[in-house]
Amino acid sequence: MTPPAFPSFAEALRVWLRIGLLSFGGPAAQIAVMHREVVEDRHWVSDARFLHALNFCMLLPGPEAQQLATYLGWLMHGVKGGLAAGLLFIVPGAAVMLALSIIYATLGEVPVVAALFFGLKCAVLVLVVEALLRVAKRALKGATPWLLAAAAFLALAVFAVPFPFVVLGALAIGYAAPGAFAGGGHGTAKAGPPALLDAAIAAEPDRIARMAPAARRAGLVGLAVWLWPVVLLMGAGVWGDIAWFFSKMAVVTFGGAYAVLAYVAQEAVEHYRWLTAPEMLAGLGLAETTPGPLILVLQFVGFLAGYRDSGVAGGVAGSLLTLLVTFAPCFAWIFLGAPFVERMHEAPRLKGALAGVTAAVVGVIANLALWFGLRVIFAEVRHISLGPASIDLPAFATVQPSALALAFLAAVLLFKLKFGLAKTLAVSAGAGLALSFLPL
């Protein structure tokens, strides 16, 4: 039997666009979509290499799912592959966010759009839970990884430990005791023939070395593209403020949008006065329900900053400027770091360190799943504090039967009827719209 051919660049483009269009619901759901597409369905990438790349991306500032797409795209087709995968992960969501920002600024909230996205969120919740179970089963082999995953979950969900400390702690534990992770972590692979990318790398031992110089050049260009608007627009009123503020955000967004949301809200609302607190919450709601990384909430803030200064045209300019200074460094980090990380793929201590991060990632995904699930299923969630501990608890009286019904529908479509991802999301969105017309 002839083995399947390595995917062409054109074929990869179609898949990266598909991932960009289907990546609703934040990083946990987006990573789940990517894993299903490139690992489960197409066998382009092995579990081991996917988790190895994810572990590195978790250490970087910026949206880890977008950086993971860039990393995998680079591995498959070099710099052009990384640029294509990373851009196609951003562009669909950015286009939707721009359109919704214009609608919001000119017309206010649109109930029909909210109903469609409500159905999508319920389906995405099912995807997140499925991804959590799948990754845990394959990544956690032995007592130590399970304990580390549980510790990471408790640190984030109960004790509000900053995300970078959780990841760095897991990295240190894995580095110090690589033997404790020998049976799992990013070295665990599913039995069967090697994935297409892994087979290609095995057949060309110098593949990474040949790709590295171009990646380094692309990384340096990415840094220049990131910094030139900051220098060029310095002192240029709102445009200089947008370039400077969001370029700072690009290097402190460890843990995704939620980790820096309070700071962004404080500065954008109280210091720059680009928008009000309710508008900030509306922007987060839009970012949660559009494809692409949640950090697109910054695009909404940039749009309103430009809109308040120069109308819709200014809003579009502010939106594009925000996107540029937010995402250009994300490409730079990957192109500069990925060749080194790939060369160290089999170094025992680095392998152990990244396996420790893999275990912590399971706890991170569990925390994101809990956060997302509570806010989808319940209309009201209370934050309870007791000494150093704090936890989100739902107001059980505010349970939303429609959300439970839509999540159940998505589970049946995915697991019982074996619907594809796109069809499941489309049916769920339509069901959410239909439910909005019922007198519930």
Regions found by a protein language model. Name each.
Residues M1-L60, E64, Y71-T290, L294-L440:
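Multi-pass membrane proteins that catalyze or facilitate reactions on polyprenyl-/lipid-phosphate substrates
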